[in-house]
Amino acid sequence: MLKRDQSEMDIEAETANMGKEEKESFVHKRQKYRQEQEEKRLAAKKGVSFEQPEDGEIKLPKKRYYRQRAHSNPFSDHQLEYPESPADMDWDVLYPNRKEGQKVEVADIGCGFGGLLVALSPQLPNQLILGMEIRVQVTNYVEDRIVALRHQNKETDGYQNISVLRGNAMKFLPNFFEKGQLSKIFFCFPDPHFKQRKHKARIVTTTLCSEYAYVVRPGGIVYTITDVKDLHEWMVKHLAAHPLFERLTKEEEDADPCVATMLVETEEGKKVARNEGDKFVACFRRKENPEW
């Protein structure tokens, strides 16, 4: 039996209640929309102009044209591009206005549709913020969202400090970031992987905690939030057990403006709030390196 392409299954789910003509019309519109957005995205990356609407305004992307499943298998071969080392990464492609020598300091792992990135941009105006997302269409949506926001705020150079790339942080994080490069790293509503045999695919594990300790500088913060209590306890257990992390006190968390932003600005967080669900937060500080 042939394995169907993910996009085919997404289309079936989206058009399940549509008639034949309505379904064909929707598929055609989505293909045309995605093609137009891809052309704009490539043009923006190359720094060349592209045809704009008559009113000169680049509109924010429409989420319905970027449908994709909620999660992706991090162990699958996703044919990702990644640098051999951080020194090989061309950050100017993602941040055209960055200052010479300026490096990414904040990472949102599994950034979803970019709500936290957009909220953090004006909050941390002097820091480069990167979202990493493994799903193709979700990454494309965030790229298009940033292109539109930059265009809409070009007079003030708004949103020049955020960007997104498609990548697998569980495999290639040290390929992008140097030792101690990050001051903040966010894990917002990650895949809970409920089944015990899937726990190895969780974004916080004993092995991965060591990688996070490598890329986060002493004094830097690891932010976690989830609506799944079991996952919250799992992340707390593994981070607390690592010798290079210590948990922030409740008072320290309450005083951190990034925690307040994380609680309300992600798309998943807003969904949890609408459903009156719980949100579990835990933040950990990177300890100083031991003296050998």
Curated annotation (Swiss-Prot):
Q: Is Nucleotide-binding among this UniProt entry's keywords?
A: no
Pfam families in the record: Methyltransf_4 (PF02390)
Q: List keywords of the entry alphabetically.
A: Methyltransferase, Nucleus, RNA-binding, S-adenosyl-L-methionine, Transferase, tRNA processing, tRNA-binding
Record GO biological process: RNA (guanine-N7)-methylation; tRNA methylation
- A molecular function GO annotation: tRNA (guanine(46)-N7)-methyltransferase activity
Q: Which residues bind S-adenosyl-L-methionine?
A: G110, E133, I134, N168, A169, C188, T266, E267, E268
Query: What domain of life?
Result: Eukaryota
* CDD domains linked: AdoMet_MTases
Question: What Enzyme Commission number does this protein have?
Answer: 2.1.1.33
For this protein, the record's HAMAP family field holds:
tRNA_methyltr_TrmB_euk (MF_03055)
Q: What is the protein's given name?
A: tRNA (guanine-N(7)-)-methyltransferase
Q: Which gene encodes it?
A: TRM8
